[in-house]
Amino acid sequence: MLSYCLLVTGPAYGTQQASSALQFAQALLAEGHRLKSVFFYREGVLNANQLTSPANDEFDLVRAWQLLGETHQVALNVCVAAALRRGVTDAQQAAQLNLAGANLQPGFVLSGLGELAQSVLTCDRVIQF
């Protein structure tokens, strides 16, 4: 059994990166491997935007990530710098920066690149999407 960490750099919609990462995560968990964390970076931080509202007949990727994190105790880390540049923030950052409100999906956590570095050091495999 291997431990994996995923790096997601694609948005929830518009490319296949995030949906491929989710399918890969589900497959490796089904095979008995351990998914320690998912780090959302660059456009990937948009996977943590709770204001994303897909059409009724579309797959809700943001909520699917949230469910995966809750069900399998997977850390869903979001790069704080990349998130703030793209309008994704939690209540603490919103208050510090005098922003109108927070929109980070529950289950996701703003974190720094140190979290990614730690994952690279502690996981058997790091896969980028």
Curated annotation (Swiss-Prot):
SUPFAM superfamilies reported for this sequence: DsrEFH-like
Enzyme class: transferase
Localization per Swiss-Prot or TrEMBL: Cytoplasm
GO cellular component labels: sulfurtransferase complex
Function statement: Part of a sulfur-relay system required for 2-thiolation of 5-methylaminomethyl-2-thiouridine (mnm(5)s(2)U) at tRNA wobble positions. Accepts sulfur from TusA and transfers it in turn to TusE.
Family to which the UniProt record says this protein belongs: Belongs to the DsrE/TusD family.
Name of protein: Sulfurtransferase TusD
Organism listed in the record: Pectobacterium carotovorum subsp. carotovorum (strain PC1)
